């Protein structure tokens, strides 16, 4: 199989796994989302739907190009958090992300700090974009959570609240590059914070996700201060060429890396975290067995038990390890296996050559 066809097939698989729609037959209808209507955007700024509605935006529409740029940037950071901005517009109850660019920030394993040079870069980039005819404004920021899921920490909530106060519409996107490599599908979340004095209704979490034990407290304290948006993806008729150019970098990194080897520290941390959660679940089980059942305990019983959550986490670790092992087996078959026909041709003696000379 040709390398180009292998890369194209891998890109198509990536698009299918992440529910990125195929190009439509009518390019004009497909590219309509890219048309920027300044009057419509100015009208939204005048009406300010976010002033009276605690969640005016319920959907995030992200272009395939912006998604891949954010994933490549997040993967390049490894275990260090990275940060960037997103450009786009708003359409009804949706924030449309059309492009993204990285910021030169100082990152650690748990946070990112934007310095003065990052703000200068941000202003200069936006100015040059306008000069080039790209009229889209900044509509949000993205950053990575390497290995600990897509949610907003206390610092993230404060940052997002500040941005929503002065720069609406604004969206927060979180990508987990470590879990993306392990699972194959992009681990991503899009969020907006509620107004400061707003108390949201008590609703169950729509989708379960694994949170490390040392992050659960931070997650639990702030999880009612923001809400998640439904994410969909789109691409234009001209995106294919740009995606091909960007995919070459992503594809080479995918081929040359192994989730089993590259994520060893992450997997070891997950197993240690699982052991701590098992110990905690055992302690809670002992208390519930010998203690009095209070009303708060009965309410907790209606929720998923800690042991059931541990079972989910262990199943997820197992599935990711099997996925990594399968990818290694497939790569071994593709690049290291020798065909039987080649073996036979190399081991068989060459009968077509000249006969050896024998003295009479």
Curated annotation (Swiss-Prot):
<dbReference type="GO" id="GO:1990641">
    <property type="term" value="P:response to iron ion starvation"/>
</dbReference>
<keyword id="KW-0378">Hydrolase</keyword>
<dbReference type="Pfam" id="PF01398">
    <property type="entry name" value="JAB"/>
</dbReference>
<comment type="similarity">
    <text>Belongs to the peptidase M67A family. CSN5 subfamily.</text>
</comment>
<dbReference type="GO" id="GO:0046872">
    <property type="term" value="F:metal ion binding"/>
</dbReference>
<feature type="region of interest" description="Disordered">
    <location>
        <begin position="341"/>
        <end position="360"/>
    </location>
</feature>
<dbReference type="GO" id="GO:0019784">
    <property type="term" value="F:deNEDDylase activity"/>
</dbReference>
<feature type="binding site">
    <location>
        <position position="156"/>
    </location>
    <ligand>
        <name>Zn(2+)</name>
    </ligand>
</feature>
<dbReference type="GO" id="GO:0005737">
    <property type="term" value="C:cytoplasm"/>
</dbReference>
<keyword id="KW-0736">Signalosome</keyword>
<keyword id="KW-0482">Metalloprotease</keyword>
<keyword id="KW-0217">Developmental protein</keyword>
<feature type="compositionally biased region" description="Polar residues">
    <location>
        <begin position="341"/>
        <end position="350"/>
    </location>
</feature>
<dbReference type="InterPro" id="IPR050242">
    <property type="entry name" value="JAMM_MPN+_peptidase_M67A"/>
</dbReference>
<feature type="binding site">
    <location>
        <position position="145"/>
    </location>
    <ligand>
        <name>Zn(2+)</name>
    </ligand>
</feature>
<comment type="subunit">
    <text>Component of the CSN complex, probably composed of CSN1, CSN2, CSN3, CSN4, CSN5, CSN6, CSN7 and CSN8. Interacts with MCM2.</text>
</comment>
<dbReference type="GO" id="GO:0006508">
    <property type="term" value="P:proteolysis"/>
</dbReference>
<comment type="function">
    <text>Probable protease subunit of the COP9 signalosome complex (CSN), a complex involved in various cellular and developmental processes such as photomorphogenesis and response to hormones. The CSN complex is an essential regulator of the ubiquitin (Ubl) conjugation pathway by mediating the deneddylation of the cullin subunits of SCF-type E3 ligase complexes, leading to decrease the Ubl ligase activity of SCF. Involved in early response to iron deficiency.</text>
</comment>
<feature type="short sequence motif" description="JAMM motif">
    <location>
        <begin position="143"/>
        <end position="156"/>
    </location>
</feature>
<keyword id="KW-0479">Metal-binding</keyword>
<protein>
    <recommendedName>
        <fullName>COP9 signalosome complex subunit 5</fullName>
    </recommendedName>
</protein>
<dbReference type="InterPro" id="IPR000555">
    <property type="entry name" value="JAMM/MPN+_dom"/>
</dbReference>
<feature type="region of interest" description="Disordered">
    <location>
        <begin position="293"/>
        <end position="315"/>
    </location>
</feature>
<dbReference type="GO" id="GO:0051726">
    <property type="term" value="P:regulation of cell cycle"/>
</dbReference>
<dbReference type="GO" id="GO:0008237">
    <property type="term" value="F:metallopeptidase activity"/>
</dbReference>
<dbReference type="InterPro" id="IPR040961">
    <property type="entry name" value="CSN5_C"/>
</dbReference>
<dbReference type="GO" id="GO:0008180">
    <property type="term" value="C:COP9 signalosome"/>
</dbReference>
<keyword id="KW-0645">Protease</keyword>
<feature type="binding site">
    <location>
        <position position="143"/>
    </location>
    <ligand>
        <name>Zn(2+)</name>
    </ligand>
</feature>
<dbReference type="InterPro" id="IPR037518">
    <property type="entry name" value="MPN"/>
</dbReference>
<feature type="domain" description="MPN">
    <location>
        <begin position="60"/>
        <end position="197"/>
    </location>
</feature>
<dbReference type="Pfam" id="PF18323">
    <property type="entry name" value="CSN5_C"/>
</dbReference>
<keyword id="KW-0862">Zinc</keyword>
